[in-house]
């Protein structure tokens, strides 16, 4: 009886860390949120991704009504497995940070790149990562904004995990939009570094 109780308690306490992990958040705007979500779901240490809107004028934005908002992805990650700095490096190398008018075939502010820092430590790390990315690209001016994170609003359910729900449409869109080709043009051998299977 005591052995059974001890075993049950051991199993219960070893299960706690999995459900009560130490997690942190990162928020990146990198053009179409379907693509950013797909890319970061492949990064080890990322626990979840959520497509949404951030930085605009209205509460509860929708795809049809999100003035001033950018499409963005909120990333929940385990800092014991992946650092914020590694996420930043992967982010910069998965977009064209020199383009201030949008990303790839998607044009306009809502598709422009930004890092929304959650706290001062992330703000400093993001500024450093932007500087390092600019140097890696030969000292060019980067258009990616680095700003404190306001409220993040999750997008409609049909946008979540779009690449798994509609794989053919997603692959067609990503290819036709020229995302991967442009990232390779900008970054060369560093393109998509840190993102598995890319």
Spans of model-derived segments:
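Flexible coil/turn and secondary-structure edge motifs
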Residues: 2, 19-198
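Bacterial N-terminal signal peptides
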Residues: 3-14
């Amino acid at each position: 009886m005591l052995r059974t109780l001890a075993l049950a308690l051991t199993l219960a306490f070893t299960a706690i860390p999995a459900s009560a992990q130490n997690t942190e958040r990162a928020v990146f705007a990198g053009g179409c949120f379907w693509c950013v979500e797909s890319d970061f779901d492949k990064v080890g240490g990322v626990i979840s991704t959520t497509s949404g809107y951030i930085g605009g004028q209205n509460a509860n934005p929708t795809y049809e009504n999100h003035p001033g908002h950018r499409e963005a992805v909120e990333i929940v990650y385990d800092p014991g497995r992946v650092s914020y700095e590694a996420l930043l490096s992967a982010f910069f190398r998965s977009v064209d940070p020199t383009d201030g008018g949008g990303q790839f075939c998607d044009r306009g502010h809502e598709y422009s790149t930004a890092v929304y820092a959650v706290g001062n430590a992330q703000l400093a790390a993001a500024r450093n990562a932007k500087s390092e990315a600019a140097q890696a690209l030969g000292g060019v001016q980067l258009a990616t904004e680095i700003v404190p994170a306001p409220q993040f609003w999750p997008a409609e359910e049909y946008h979540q995990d779009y690449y798994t729900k509609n794989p053919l449409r997603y692959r067609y869109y990503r290819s036709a939009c020229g995302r991967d080709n442009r990232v390779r043009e900008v970054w060369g051998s560093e393109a998509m570094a840190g993102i598995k299977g890319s």
